[in-house]
Structures are given as structure tokens and as C-alpha cells.
Amino acid sequence: FNSVYIFTLQGDEPLVSPNLIDSLAEAIQNSDFDCATPIIRIYNLTEYLNPNFVKVTKSITGKALYFSRSPIPYVRGNSFDVGNFDCEKFFIENNFYSHIGLYAYKYKSLEKFSLLPESNYEHYEALEQLRMLENGMNLLCVETTHKACAVDVPSDVSKTEEIMKKMGIK
């Protein structure tokens, strides 16, 4: 099973692009990482502060460093006071990312992950990918421009239905 890859898509991400799945497949095949997952740039303060948007920090090689529902990285000395802060410029000039709930695992890595008990940070944040990080597994962050349509709260259902209607999906 050395060349078998398993993809998991979280149920709250109903409109993931097939192209995004293809890019994850390519990324995991050509890497030494255990798992690959997509990330997308954050361009506004609302998403950055919203706990339903899972934020991620990564190394320059794309290795995930941490995932959180809190705003990470923390911006020291900046209150995001709208009166004296150019929010749009800030997010354009700085790389802040949010996570999309799709994973491409190497078979052996998923097998290992499935045997691990819930970790401390996973319990605190309710984010299973933290179990991998806490146990020394390597997650590759694959940047995308595909904006996912997550359904995290009841008000997201009508937004998603409207997008699906525009796409011709019933």
C-alpha cells in the first residue's frame, strides 16, 4: 500500500472543487509528508477573528506549524482599530491563512493516525489535525485560491444553497 492515498472531505465543505482534489493528489505524491491539506489566504478581519474559520501557520517549506480557531499568528501591538488601521492593506501585505477541511493521506500515515488517542490540543481546539502535529507527523499546506463554502452555522446553509442554485445544482 505504499502508493495508496486516502482522501477525506469534511461534510461541512460541500462544494470543494475537483481541481483542488487533483492539486492535493499531486502534492502528496511528490512529498515526504504524511498528509496534505489545502489552505487559503485570509483577506479580511472578519474571517481572521471568526472561530469557525480555522487558521493555520506554516513554515516556508509548507509544513503546518499549528492550527487554531483563535487568530494566529497573534499581531502584537495592533488592536485592529478600524479608525486608524488599513485592514485591507494589512491582509494583502501579510500572509494569513485559513484551512479547508480536505485531507490527502498516505495510507500508512492514516493507519498510524487512526491508532493515536485524542491529543491535548486536539481536545482544546476540536481540531483533529492537531493530533498529527502533536505526534510528530508532518502536514503539507497546499495554498489554493479556491474559496470553499463551509457550512459551520445555520446561516451558512442558505448561503450555500444560493451558491448551489447559481451553479445549477439542485
Regions found by a protein language model. Give the residues of each.
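Conserved core of the sugar-phosphate nucleotidyltransferase
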Residues: 16-116
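Conserved alpha/beta core of the MobA/IspD/sugar-nucleotide pyrophosphorylase nucleotidyltransferase superfamily
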Residues: 81-170
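A short, conserved beta-strand element in the Rossmann-like catalytic core
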Residues: 14-15, 148
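Short beta-strand-to-loop acidic/aromatic patch adjacent to the donor-nucleotide binding site
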Residues: 1-11
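A secondary-structure boundary/capping signal
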Residues: 9-11, 39, 106, 153
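Short, high-confidence coil segments that cap the C-terminus of an alpha-helix
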Residues: 1-3, 31-33, 137
